[in-house]
Curated annotation (Swiss-Prot):
Domain comment quoted from the record: Lys-Thr-X-X-X-Trp motif interacts with the PDZ domain of Dvl (Disheveled) family members and is involved in the activation of the Wnt/beta-catenin signaling pathway. The FZ domain is involved in binding with Wnt ligands.
Modification Phosphoserine, positions: S654
Topology in the lipid bilayer: Multi-pass membrane protein
Protein name listed in UniProt: Frizzled-6
Bias type Low complexity, positions: 674-686
Domain FZ: 20-133
Residues on Cytoplasmic side: 224-234, 307-325, 393-417, 496-707
InterPro entries hit by this protein: Frizzled/SFRP, Frizzled/Smoothened_7TM, Frizzled_dom, Frizzled_dom_sf, FZ6_CRD, FZD6_7TM, GPCR_2-like_7TM
Organism (species): Pongo abelii
SMART domains: FRI, Frizzled
Quaternary assembly: Interacts with LMBR1L.
GO process annotations (BP): canonical Wnt signaling pathway; nervous system development; non-canonical Wnt signaling pathway
Length: 707
C-alpha cells in the first residue's frame, strides 16, 4: 500500500517538479524588505517574477504609495506580495486578504491619482483569509545558513517559464517545452531572418524541380499505360505521391508564414507564434496532404520491392501480381490514412516556419519519434530486405543462364537498373533518417541554449545547465528538406530511356496538324524515290535474275479521308511471287475499287483477288496459314476461268498456266495488308515497283501509321 501511495504521489507531482524543480528558499536581497521580520523568500512570486532583481524593479511602480505612507501597512503588504515569506514548514506565505483590503482602501485615492495599475494577481478577492496574530518564527541559525542558501539560489533551476508574449488562450491545446498554453515564437527560434529567406528560396527551388520530374514520370505513364505493368506499376503511384508532396512545399513557399504562424495581437500583448493544433483550417489541410502522401510514397516503394520480390524470387507472372493490386492499394492508402487520422485526433499538427507548411514532430519529440522516424525506419528495413532477396534471386537466375549470352546481358542490365534506382531512393531516405535521429539527440540541448540566450530579453528564468551551448546548423535543416524532396526524383531514372523519348516524339507528332495537300505531295515523292531506288537495283542484278524468285512490291497511297480505325495516308508494301519476268521499266497503275484496296498483279497481266488481310502487328501462325490457304485454293480453282476472262477484257493476255500459277502463288503464303478501309480508297493510287529478287519479304507491317 505504501508503494502504491508513493507511486501515485510521484505521478501527481512529477509535472510540477519538471516545471519548477525542487522547493528551495533563498535569503532576501531587496533593500526595502530586509527590515521585515523574515529574511527568507522563494521565487517565482505571485506575479511570476523569477528573481529578486526583477521583483525590485516592479516594486518601483508602487514607491509613491510607500513614500507618502498612505497606509501604515503598505511596505509590509508590498514585501509580502513581491518578496513572499518562505519557511521550511509552510514554504510560501502570501499576504492575507484582510491586509490587502485595508491597504487598498487606504491608498485608493493615491492609486487613482498616480494612475497605478493594480496587478490582477494582487486582487484581494483572490487572496485567502489567514490569522495574522500568529507570529512568524525566526530561526537564529538563519544568518549562519545564509551563504549556503545563497549558493543554492545560484544553482536552483525552476525550469522553463513561458514568456508573456508567447502565452496563448486556453482550450487550444498548445504546449511548448513542457508548458501548457505556450507556443514557439515565429519566425523561427533558431535562425536569423536572412538565413530563413535563403532556406525558403532553396526549398522553393527544389520543390519546383521535384514537381517537374515527378509530373514527367506520371505523364509518361499516361502516354502509354500498357507499358508500365506490374511489377513496375507502383513507381507511377510513388511518383504521384511525391508530386503532391512537392506541390505542398511549393505552396508553402508561396504562402510564407501566413499559414504556419499566428498573427500578433497587440491588445492581448501577444506576439507572433507558431500554429499548434488543428484549429487553423489551412494549416490542417496542408498537414493532411503532406503527411498522408509522404507516408503513402514510402509505402508504395515498399510495395514496389514486394512486387519485384514476387516476380524475381517467387517467379510470379505479371497477371498473378496484378490480381493482388486491390490489396496493394488498400495497404498503401489505408495505412497513411489511419496515421493521419490519429494525429488529427491527438491534435499534433505543427506549423513549420521555415518551409511554410505544416507537419508533425517539429517541436514534439514524441510525435516525431513515433509517427515519422519509426514508420520510415520500418519501411526502409522491410523494403531493403525484400530488395536484397530479389537481387539474390536474379543473380542466381543469371548464373543458370550463363550460356545464353543475350538473355544474360538483358538480365544484367535489369539488375543494374534496379540497383541504381534503389540507390537513388535509399541514399536520400537514409540521410533523412540520420537528420531525424541527430535532431532527436540534440533537440533538448538546442532548446536550453535558446532559453539561455533569450531569458533576459523575455524576462524569464535562465537555466544554469547551459554550460556547453549548442545551436543547430542551417545546413542540417536544408539537407533534411532536400532529402525529403529529392527522394521523388529517383522515378525519373526508371522511365528515362530511349523508348520514353520515342513515345514523347510520337505523342507530339500525332498532335501536330498537317496540310492534306502537302502530305499528298510528300507521299507521291516518297513513292517515286522508292521506285527509282529499287529499279536501279533491278538493273544492276539483271544478269542474275531467276524467274522463280522474282518479287514485286506494290505501294498503295491513299489520298482520301478514312473514317475507320486505321490511319489516313497509310503505306503498305507487299511482296508478290511470280514465275514470269516483267520489263524492268514497267510501271502499272492499278485503279482500286471499294471492293478491293489492292490486287495481286502477275507478270503476265492477270489479276487475282488478294488474300485475307493479316492483323496489325501480329504475324500469322503456321497452322492458321495452312488452313486458310487450303480453303482459298478451292475458291481460286473455281474462279480461274472468270479471272482469265476478266484479264482479257482489260486488254491483257492470260496464259494457259494461270490456274496452275494460282496454286503456286498460294503456296507462297502471301498476305496483303490493307492500309485503309474500303470506304477511303476512292481516288487512291497504286504503284507497281520491280524490286530485286533478294528483297526481304515484309510480314505484318501494314498497320503502321505515319501520323
Amino acid at each position: 500500500m505504501e508503494m502504491f501511495t508513493f507511486f501515485l504521489l510521484t505521478c501527481i507531482f512529477l509535472p510540477l517538479v519538471r516545471g519548477h524543480s525542487l522547493f528551495t528558499c533563498e535569503p532576501i536581497t531587496v533593500p526595502r524588505c530586509m527590515k521585515m521580520a523574515y529574511n527568507m523568500t522563494f521565487f517565482p512570486n505571485l506575479m511570476g517574477h523569477y528573481d529578486q532583481s526583477i521583483a525590485a524593479v516592479e516594486m518601483e511602480h508602487f514607491l509613491p504609495l510607500a513614500n507618502l505612507e498612505c497606509s501604515p501597512n503598505i511596505e509590509t503588504f508590498l514585501c509580502k506580495a513581491f518578496v513572499p515569506t518562505c519557511t521550511e514548514q509552510i514554504h510560501v506565505v502570501p499576504p492575507c486578504r484582510k491586509l490587502c483590503e485595508k491597504v487598498y482602501s487606504d491608498c485608493k485615492k493615491l492609486i487613482d491619482t498616480f494612475g497605478i495599475r493594480w496587478p490582477e494577481e494582487l486582487e484581494c478577492d483572490r487572496l485567502q483569509y489567514c490569522d495574522e496574530t500568529v507570529p512568524v518564527t525566526f530561526d537564529p541559525h538563519t544568518e549562519f545558513l545564509g551563504p549556503q542558501k545563497k549558493t543554492e539560489q545560484v544553482q536552483r533551476d525552476i525550469g522553463f517559464w513561458c514568456p508573456r508574449h508567447l502565452k496563448t488562450s486556453g482550450g487550444q491545446g498548445y504546449k511548448f517545452l513542457g508548458i501548457d498554453q505556450c507556443a514557439p515564437p515565429c519566425p523561427n527560434m533558431y535562425f536569423k531572418s536572412d538565413e530563413l529567406e535563403f532556406a525558403k528560396s532553396f526549398i522553393g527551388t527544389v520543390s519546383i524541380f521535384c514537381l517537374c520530374a515527378t509530373l514527367f514520370t506520371f505523364l509518361t505513364f499516361l502516354i502509354d499505360v500498357r507499358r508500365f505493368r506490374y511489377p513496375e506499376r507502383p513507381i507511377i503511384y510513388y511518383s504521384v505521391c511525391y508530386s503532391i508532396v512537392s506541390l505542398m512545399y511549393f505552396i508553402g513557399f508561396l504562402l510564407g508564414d501566413s499559414t504556419a504562424c499566428n498573427k500578433a495581437d497587440e491588445k492581448l500583448e501577444l506576439g507572433d507564434t507558431v500554429v499548434l493544433g488543428s484549429q487553423n483550417k489551412a494549416c490542417t489541410v496542408l498537414f493532411m496532404l503532406l503527411y498522408f502522401f509522404t507516408m503513402a510514397g514510402t509505402v508504395w516503394w515498399v510495395i514496389l520491392t514486394i512486387t519485384w520480390f514476387l516476380a524475381a524470387g517467387r517467379k510470379w507472372s505479371c497477371e498473378a501480381i496484378e490480381q493482388k493490386a486491390v490489396w496493394f492499394h488498400a495497404v498503401a492508402w489505408g495505412t497513411p490514412g489511419f496515421l493521419t487520422v490519429m494525429l488529427l485526433a491527438m491534435n499534433k499538427v505543427e506549423g513549420d516556419n521555415i518551409s511554410g507548411v505544416c507537419f508533425v514532430g517539429l517541436y514534439d519529440l514524441d510525435a516525431s519519434r513515433y509517427f515519422v522516424l519509426l514508420p520510415l525506419c520500418l519501411c526502409v528495413f522491410v523494403g531493403l530486405s525484400l530488395l536484397l532477396a530479389g537481387i539474390i534471386s536474379l543473380n542466381h537466375v543469371r548464373q543458370v543462364i550463363q550460356h545464353d549470352g543475350r538473355n544474360q546481358e538483358k538480365l544484367k542490365k535489369f539488375m543494374i537498373r534496379i540497383g541504381v534506382f534503389s540507390g537513388l531512393y535509399l541514399v536520400p531516405l537514409v540521410t533523412l533518417l540520420g537528420c531525424y535521429v541527430y535532431e532527436q539527440v540534440n533537440r533538448i540541448t538546442w532548446e536550453i541554449t535558446w532559453v539561455s540566450d533569450h531569458c533576459r530579453q523575455y524576462h524569464i528564468p535562465c537555466p544554469y545547465q547551459a554550460k556547453a551551448k549548442a545551436r543547430p546548423e542551417l545546413a542540417l535543416f536544408m539537407i533534411k528538406y532536400l532529402m525529403t524532396l529529392i527522394v521523388g526524383i529517383s522515378a525519373v531514372f526508371w522511365v528515362g530511356s530511349k523508348k520514353t523519348c520515342t513515345e514523347w516524339a510520337g505523342f507530339f507528332k500525332r498532335n501536330r496538324k498537317r496540310d492534306p495537300i502537302s502530305e499528298s505531295r510528300r507521299v507521291l515523292q516518297e513513292s517515286c524515290e522508292f521506285f527509282l531506288k529499287h529499279n536501279s537495283k533491278v538493273k544492276h542484278k539483271k544478269k542474275h535474275y531467276k524467274p522463280s524468285s522474282h518479287k514485286l512490291k506494290v505501294i498503295s497511297k491513299s489520298m482520301g479521308t478514312s473514317t475507320g480505325a486505321t490511319a489516313n495516308h497509310g503505306t503498305s508494301a507487299v511482296a508478290i511471287t511470280s514465275h514470269d519476268y516483267l520489263g524492268q521499266e514497267t510501271l502499272t497503275e492499278i485503279q482500286t475499287s471499294p471492293e478491293t484496296s489492292m490486287r495481286e498483279v502477275k507478270a503476265d497481266g492477270a489479276s487475282t483477288p488478294r488474300l485475307r488481310e493479316q492483323d496489325c502487328g501480329e504475324p500469322a501462325s503456321p497452322a492458321a496459314s495452312i488452313s486458310r490457304l487450303s480453303g482459298e485454293q478451292v475458291d481460286r480453282k473455281g474462279q480461274a476461268g472468270s479471272v482469265s476472262e476478266s484479264a482479257r477484257s482489260e486488254g491483257r493476255i492470260s496464259p494457259k498456266s494461270d490456274i496452275t500459277d494460282t496454286g503456286l502463288a498460294q503456296s507462297n503464303n502471301l498476305q496483303v495488308p490493307s492500309s485503309s478501309e474500303p470506304s477511303s480508297l476512292k481516288g487512291s493510287t497504286s504503284l507497281l515497283v520491280h524490286p530485286v529478287s533478294g528483297v526481304r519479304k515484309e510480314q505484318g507491317g501494314g498497320c503502321h501509321s505515319d501520323t
